[in-house]
Every structure is written in C-alpha cells, then in structure tokens.
Amino acid sequence: MGLHLYDTRRRRVRPFEPLRPGHVGVYVCGPTVQAAPHVGHIRTALPFDLLRRWLVQSGRSVTFVQNVTDIDDKIIINADRDGTSVWELATRQTRAFDDAYRTLGILPPTIQPRATGHIPEMIALVSALVEGGYAYASGGSVWFRVGAFADYGALSHQRPDAMQPSVEAEPGKADPRDFALWKAARPGEPFWSSPWGDGRPGWHLECSAMAGKYLGPVFDIHGGGLDLVFPHHENERAQTVCAATARPASNAASADSPGPGGGEPGGGEPSSGEMARYWMHVGLLTTGGTKMSKSLGNSVLVADALDAVRPQVLRYHLLSAHYRSTLEYSAEALAESTAAHDRVETFVRNALDILGGPGEAAALAADEVVSSVAGAQPTVAGARPVPVPGPGGESRLTPRRAWSDFTIAMDDDLAVGRALAALFGAVSQGNQVLSKAHSRELAGWVDVTRRMLNIFGLDPHEQWPTAGAEFRPALDGAMQVVLDLRSAARARRDYAEADAIRSRLAAAGLIVEDTPEGQRWHLA
C-alpha cells in the first residue's frame, strides 16, 4: 500500500510521493511566543512528531523545519503589558516551548529558525513580489495584491469574490482583501530598515521566507493547526508561488514552472508551481465542546496539565484521536487515557522483568519477530531504517501479524485508532503468556509492543529515561532489602506489617506488586 496522506489542498487522501526518493522535507508552523505554551500547542505538534517517527521507521530521512515567530503584534502587546522588552519575552517563552516539547517527548526540529534572524530573506521575497507586480507599497507598508493571484482561495476552498476583508483594515490598501507583507514602523515598536522605510515583517511573510531558505520554493509537506488554513497558509501559498514565478528561472522552482495558480485545474496533482506538495492540518482541541484558545480564556497551560498527569499520559491522550479529528480535553478523558496507558506500560514492565531486561528479551524475540526493537529510536535526518517484520498472512494473531496490522493503519493517513487497536491486541496476547517465564512467545509480544510504542514516542524503557539512573543499582539493592523484610513478615503471617511496608513505600513513590512470580516494584 505505502504511505497515504490527506491533502487539504486536494481534499482527499493521496499516495505520498516525496520530491526526492528517500528524503522528506517538512515545514511545520511553530509557535508565536507571546505567552506560555498550552495543551492546544502540544496537540498540534504531536501528530507531526508521530509522522516524522513513522517516516524514519519507513526508511526515509527527514529534514524537519519548525519556526519560531518571535516578532508579532501579540508579542509586542504582551511585552508592553508586562513591562518587559519584546526580546526578553520572546526568549523566555521560546525556552518554555522548548522545555514543553522536550518534556512531552517531541523530537527537536532539524532546523528551528527564528523570524527575526531572517529579515534579509523576507525583504528579498517582498522585493520579488513588488517587481513582479504582485505587491505594492503604500505609506511605508507593502501589501500583497490578492487579485493578482488567480488561484487565491484554492487551499481553503473559498471563492475570492466571496471573501471578507483582511483583518488589517488600514488606509492605503487597493483591495480590502489585500494583506500586509511589510508593516510600517510605529512609535515604540521594533523595526528594521527596508527599501520601503523602517518597519517589520508581516506574519505570513515570515514562514514563506524561512521555508524557502531551508527547504526550497517547493517541498514535500507543510503542516499546522486547522485554524491556520485561512488566512495564514492561504497567504503563505499565494506569496510563495507568486514570488517563485516572479523571480528568474534559476531561483524559481523550475524553469518551466506554470504561472501563479500552481497545479493542474480540476484536482490534478500539485506541480512545481505549488509551495508544498501536501498540506496537512491538525484538528482542534476542545474543552467542554469549545475550542481551547488563549483568546477564549479556556486554555490549559502545559505546566498545569502536568500537575494532573504524567507527561507520558498527556502525550498518549493527545495522540489517541486521529490528527484530523476534534479531541476533547477533560478530567474524564484524561482518566480513561491514564488507565489505557498504564495497562500497556504495566505489561511492558512486567514482561521485561520476567525476561531479564530489554537485552535478554530482544535475544529471545529474535526468532519470533525477526529482529529486536533495541536501538530503533527515530532520529534526525539521515537515520537508517529499522528492520521490521514482513507482512503477516497468519490466520491467528501473532507478533508479526500485529505489526502488519499496525503498519497498514499507520500508512493509511496515520489511522491511530486502528494502530492502537493493534497495540492493545498485542498487549492482550502478551498478558495471556505473561506467566511463561523466559518464553519466546512473551518476548515476541513485548518486542512488537515496544516497536509500536516507539513510533508513538511512548516506549517506557527507551523514550523516558529516569533521572538519576546512576543511582539505580543502589536503589535496587536497597529495595531488595526492604522486600526481603516484607517477605519475612508474610512468612510469619504478620500481614499487617507487610501491608504497612507496602503502604510506606507507596507514599514514597515506590509501588510494590505481588505476582505469581514474586514481588515486583517500580516507580509510581
């Protein structure tokens, strides 16, 4: 089957065919660092992390670019309100976003450009648009001429003549729909020199310039939240396609690129005149049925969310629905995700304990599922593909068949519902053979479970290393002494003492479980 992805521009799922075989260029619109990150930001970022991991697993190298918008009207307003500088606010909140992404296991971008570090590229892009007749200067600002782009509205599937005026209702615009490429300087605001006077870039311009610098005028995948389809991505596409057409052929996508309007009419495949071959958008995160956003005052900060649940659980919950669907965030939904995640994590932990650890499990699993998950962490561009089991044709569920089901689901536009069904099927089968110590069958099930968890960024052994790992041998030894004391209490039928020991350990964050194979412990 191969990977298929839904393309917003074409309104259908299409086979994924990168421009360069074996390599994928991805640009995702990153945060405007005006305030602390909320859960909605993570909801948008995680599906692209999942996609990236799957692309690498499938044998492709990935150049993943995610920008930081560090100059914007909202940043200026918030900095003024807080009595701080724009630069201090932007730097502080950029760190907060980086910390939140890292805490949630999101792989760092290959390139993370800041808008303010790319002003020359933005000025060059505006100059090309002005020279090509697609933009005009007025009062120190520069506006994109929407009427000059015949395909405007194609991404968001709107008719240009039915569109409302842009939010920038300022004098000097030739058409109410025109949007700002360059904004004339205002008193007290940051500015840069330009051929049109002092000013600063418009929001849409920033992403076009940075995507073009690092991925070229045409690249594979452009992503973001559903709320960015219009006007942000529509405007990005318009100015990028027109700039590529206006520039000399050596700087454009192709010497024989079509004029503004890009791909073939009537739903044909995107051509070299497009900005991105595939446009992907993540559905909204809601709370109480209403979109979560700062402007509505119902956003939940990542820091507050992590006071309620572990990072792994939050990551699981935000990935548990298909990326194009709406996902509800509530205490009840988080409780369900906690139970589901704990079931998987408990199986992996118990299985690895029985089998003697990841290395031993991998060796036992070699005959069962061809190769081990050990060392299969997705990495940045250039990573080698991980060996995977071949397609399964078994009538009964086996680790090989479970992986095949998982692969088919992920290749179908990241169908996480079916992928999670394959995961929980593997966990269920593994739990049934959990008592078979050093069983190849158990090793096979835990191996394939960890393969799937690895794609979701949730392998409890590999993806979430415990801080203070150098103290683990000492902790293991100390815990064995305590567990021996508890065993002695049970042997003399002093169950009150045994329960008291377990309760005191639980209060300290150390969970003891009694199993047919003996006592096991793990961190809460």
Swiss-Prot record:
- The short motif 'HIGH' region is annotated over 31-41
Entry-linked Pfam families: CysS_C, tRNA-synt_1e
| Enzyme Commission code(s) on record | 6.1.1.16
One GO-annotated biological process of the protein: cysteinyl-tRNA aminoacylation
Q: How is the cofactor bound?
A: Binds 1 zinc ion per subunit.
Name the chemical reaction catalysed here.
tRNA(Cys) + L-cysteine + ATP = L-cysteinyl-tRNA(Cys) + AMP + diphosphate
Q: Where is this motif: 'KMSKS' region?
A: 291-295
List residues binding Zn(2+). Answer: 29, 207, 232, 236
Oligomeric form and interacting partners:
Monomer.
The name of this protein is Cysteine--tRNA ligase
Gene name, per UniProt, is cysS
